[in-house]
């Protein structure tokens, strides 16, 4: 009887151990499956972060002065494309940061919440580009009295000038250079996708030593300028150039 009881007890203990091991194995399998899925999701997210981003493909500066060497760069054109493998980049969430070592300016695109009463279409042009930096003299820009419907690149420049000088808005404009799928034509949320190219255009009004734009502003010769074009997600495009020691042309390639 005793041996039988001991045998039954041993069997019960053995069965209990098997059940505990089975439960533990189930927990381990479930946990490993969860961790595997989590790792795969994290890997995909990391890959997307690395691949996503924006690239600066060129920067041009413009001075309206005659001769050019007597003036400063008052306008910049920053050409951007998406990184290879990048998803769509909403330019409405992009920031352009510029610094000359004395100040750091942060430009943004139109925002429906911050810019109520304005239209996104004031700051984007998607037609043929005859000249991306049309000439303006002081009378042309100082006489701008309101926003205007955009029918040319010049209209975007004038609207940006008015926004900065009259409404104190740090805005950049967008000129569509290449856009096969029309993703950049959505003025409220222009999206830079594969094969697309856009020009971010901006005035250098913040680069003014006496805070009075009416008597001159801009980036002088031999000035080191650094910055970034920062998307909402992914890697930012690098801005890093030094302006020429002498401005010999009105339009200059800077980077």
Curated annotation (Swiss-Prot):
The keyword GTP-binding does not apply. Keywords: Archaeal flagellum. Residues 1-4 form a propeptide. It holds the Pfam family Arch_flagellin. Belongs to the archaeal flagellin family. Flagellin is the subunit protein which polymerizes to form the filaments of archaeal flagella. PANTHER family: FLAGELLIN B1 (PTHR35903:SF1). This is Flagellin B5. It comes from Pyrococcus horikoshii (strain ATCC 700860 / DSM 12428 / JCM 9974 / NBRC 100139 / OT-3).
């Amino acid at each position: 009887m005793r041996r039988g009881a001991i045998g039954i007890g041993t069997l019960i203990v053995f069965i209990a151990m098997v059940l505990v091991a089975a439960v533990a194995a189930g927990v381990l399998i479930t946990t490993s499956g969860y961790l595997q899925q989590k790792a795969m999701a994290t890997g995909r997210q990391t890959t997307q972060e690395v691949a996503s981003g924006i690239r600066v493909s060129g920067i041009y500066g413009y001075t309206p002065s005659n001769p050019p060497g007597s003036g400063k760069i008052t306008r910049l054109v920053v050409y951007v494309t998406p990184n290879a493998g990048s998803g769509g980049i909403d330019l409405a969430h992009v920031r352009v940061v510029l610094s000359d070592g004395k100040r750091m300016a942060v430009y943004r695109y139109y925002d429906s919440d911050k810019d109520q009463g304005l239209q996104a279409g004031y700051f984007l042009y998607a037609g043929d580009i005859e000249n991306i930096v049309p000439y303006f003299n002081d009378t042309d820009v100082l006489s701008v009295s309101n926003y205007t419907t955009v029918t040319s690149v010049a209209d975007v420049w004038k609207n940006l000038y008015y926004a900065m000088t009259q409404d104190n808005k740090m805005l950049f404009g967008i000129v569509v250079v290449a856009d096969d799928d029309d993703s950049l034509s959505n003025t409220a949320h222009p999206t830079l996708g594969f094969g697309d190219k856009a020009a971010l255009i901006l005035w250098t009004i913040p680069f003014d030593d006496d805070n009075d734009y009416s008597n001159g502003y801009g980036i002088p010769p031999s000035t080191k300028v650094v910055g970034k074009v920062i998307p909402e997600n992914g890697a930012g495009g690098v801005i890093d150039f030094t302006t020429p020691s002498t401005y010999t042309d009105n339009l200059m390639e800077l980077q």
